[in-house]
Amino acid sequence: MKAIVVPGPKQGYKLEEVPDPKPGKDEVIIRVDRAALCYRDLLQLQGYYPRMKYPVILGHEVVGTIEEVGENIKGFEVGDKVISLLYAPDGTCEYCQIGEEAYCHHRLGYSEELDGFFAEKAKIKVTSLVKVPKGTPDEGAVLVPCVTGMIYRGIRRAGGIRKGELVLVTGASGGVGIHAIQVAKALGAKVIGVTTSEEKAKIIKQYADYVIVGTKFSEEAKKIGDVTLVIDTVGTPTFDESLKSLWMGGRIVQIGNVDPSQIYNLRLGYIILKDLKIVGHASATKKDAEDTLKLTQEGKIKPVIAGTVSLENIDEGYKMIKDKNKVGKVLVKP
């Protein structure tokens, strides 16, 4: 089969012919229907993921159809449409037992210790699998593990959303931001989308209740109302304004961190005196994925796709990811 393989640290990637995977105990083989490109791929190629075992197939977001099942597989069968978590938990530890699989000490990451999904077929451990409800588009399902489900989890850990709560999303036109708007609205929020582009603002207005254009957005946000939740999909460049935007008792779900070398000098006074909470994210759990798939199936979250590329044209996909004019997510169809 064809696959995108990373041969070693900082050695880029290659399109190669590799043997078809075979299922072991507690594993299935899927036909990859869609995968997705991510900024994380670029960070992996730059050497920021020390757990990678080489050579390894790149890609950590997937939806596919089961073609083979190994021994001990229960609850899944050939023909099932599934997604995978970003990692394979052991399924037995205390964290797995309470539904926080992302905290599993023995988890293995796809596109890290395990082969990923930029391939015609993929091998997935049963502990990673989540069934996709009938009628859910592939383009929406593939976004759940690392985009919509991750956002949902961050909001859940930040205490959820009250009906009518005012939420601000930075990087609102990006692959994460445009979907963060939709997740927040699906949960009952009013949403402010922030962008630096007048052209992108026209598109964001189709999803957000309010749009602010510019890098200094906190004062404009305050004129709209009391922002009590920020979903920051950018990182260091927007974090200070995100803090300033929040009213007393507010929360930030911090998702963006495009450049790990950037350091932010945190002003503790903002956190203490405004009684703020900062929430990170470790990717979706099975329950988060199931809940988000349901919202997607119901049409409350609609995938916004900037483009779809083949394995042979994956270079074009990465050019699209780096293009600041794109809106939405870039997918791979093997």
From Swiss-Prot:
Enzyme superclass (EC): oxidoreductase
GO molecular function annotation: acryloyl-CoA reductase (NADH) activity; acryloyl-CoA reductase (NADPH) activity; zinc ion binding
Disulfide bonds: none
Keyword field: Metal-binding, NADP, Oxidoreductase, Zinc
Summary of pH dependence: Optimum pH is 6.0 at 65 degrees Celsius. Retains half maximum activity at pH 7.5 at 65 degrees Celsius.
Binding, NADP(+): 39, 173-176, 195-197
Membrane-crossing segments per the record: none
InterPro entries, A to Z: Acryloyl-CoA_Reductase_Zn-ADH, ADH-like_C, ADH-like_N, ADH_Zn_CS, GroES-like_sf, NAD(P)-bd_dom_sf, PKS_ER, Quin_OxRdtase/zeta-crystal_CS
Gene3D superfamilies in UniProt: Medium-chain alcohol dehydrogenases, catalytic domain
Record note on quaternary structure: Monomer.
PANTHER family in the cross-refs: ALCOHOL DEHYDROGENASE (ZN CONTAINING) (ADH-8) (PTHR43350:SF14), NAD-DEPENDENT ALCOHOL DEHYDROGENASE (PTHR43350)
Physiological role: Plays a role in autotrophic carbon fixation via the 3-hydroxypropionate/4-hydroxybutyrate cycle. Catalyzes the acryloyl-CoA dependent NADPH oxidation and formation of propionyl-CoA. Inactive towards 3-hydroxypropionyl-CoA, NADH and crotonyl-CoA.
This protein's name: Acryloyl-coenzyme A reductase
Naturally occurring in which organism (per UniProt): Sulfurisphaera tokodaii (strain DSM 16993 / JCM 10545 / NBRC 100140 / 7) (Sulfolobus tokodaii)
